[in-house]
Each structure stands twice: as structure tokens, then as C-alpha cells.
Amino acid sequence: MTQVRGAARRTELFDALVDLLLAEGFAQLTLDDLAARLHCSKRTLYGLAGSREQLVRAVVVHFFRGATERVEAAVRAVDGPAAQVAAYLHAVARELAPASTAFFDDVAGFPPAAEVYERNTRAAARRVQQLVDAGVAAGAFRAVHAAFVGDVVSTVMVRIQQRGVAEATGLPDARAYEALSDLLLHGLRA
């Protein structure tokens, strides 16, 4: 029972850290700040990770793991290739919507967190390519070079992740994913 309670407390702390870091970023927050805000000890935080840097990376991993589960659930909830591509990209946008500019700027400026975001961006681009491949095979999308579409989507996703789209257009990441979804779906339909 203690292990279950410990795992639940660990998840609760990671969820609270995700909420805090998404809202405020993390560059300015010390372990003392985090412990005070979460009403726990620094020792408790060190139980989650060995250093502040490792904790930030672990929180970013936790965020993307949960986001991936919810995004895939959104895809499973709909039928048809166009609906699945739309569900995927709209769910990504929903997951990123709570994240502040400070969070994205801090992730971009902290290599361990940037690597996690980049890895998840690559996985998302591969997933979109799989959905497009399935749509072309089913005749729901016109015959396009799915690898090219995947590469274009990947390039845009990387630019979103690296803050290039926000700098060039002023669009927050979540809105940029919405715009990518609209562009992609209107370009693919037969």
C-alpha cells in the first residue's frame, strides 16, 4: 500500500510541477522556490530527481508522456483519415495551449529540455506521416508523396518548437499547430 501511495504522490508532484512550469517557465525558479510553491521539502524534490536540471528534464518528459497519451486517445476517438489527422493536430494544439511563452523560451534555452521537445516533435511528425499514408491508401486524401508531406510537417513542427514560427508570425505554439492542421487538411483532401 505504501508503494501505491508513494507512486500516487510522485505523480501528483510531477503533475503540479508540470502545471507550474507550463504557467511560469522554469529558468528563474530555484529548488527552494519549487519546494515552497508545492508545499514540500527540497528532499522530496531530490527524491524525484538528483538535481534541479534533472528535475526540469523529468518534468518536461512527464508533460510530453501525458500529452502523447491524450493525443493518441483523441485520434482513437474518431474514424476516418481526415478526422484523425485533424484530431491529432488539434489535440497537440490543446496540449500545448496551457504552456506560456516563458515555458517555451526556457525549454528552447535549456538543452536537456529542448532535446525532449525535439524528440517529441520528431515523433509527432512521424505520426502525422503515418496518418497521411493511411489516408492516401484509403483514398481519403489525394495521392501525395507522404514522405514529403511528413518532411514539411516535421520542418514546420521543428520551427514551432524552436520558436521560429512565434518570432516570424507572433502565433503561440498551440495556434501554430491549429494553422498547420488547417493548411495540411485543405491541401490533402481529394
Where are these regions (language model features)?
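Hydrophobic alpha-helical connector segments
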Residues: 58, 69-98, 149-153, 177
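C-terminal peripheral helix-coil segments that are non-catalytic and often amphipathic
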Residues: 87, 94, 125-138, 162, ...
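Short secondary-structure transition hinges
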Residues: 90-130, 137, 166
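All-alpha amphipathic helical-bundle segments outside canonical DNA-binding/catalytic cores
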Residues: 82-83, 119-120, 136-154, 171-175, ...
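Amphipathic alpha-helical segments enriched in hydrophobic/aromatic and basic residues
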Residues: 21, 30-31, 42, 52, ...
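Short hydrophobic/aromatic patch on the recognition helix
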Residues: 39-49
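Generic detection of well-ordered alpha-helical segments
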Residues: 7, 11, 15, 19, ...
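Basic, helix-initiating cap at the start of DNA-binding domains
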Residues: 1-24, 28-37, 53-57
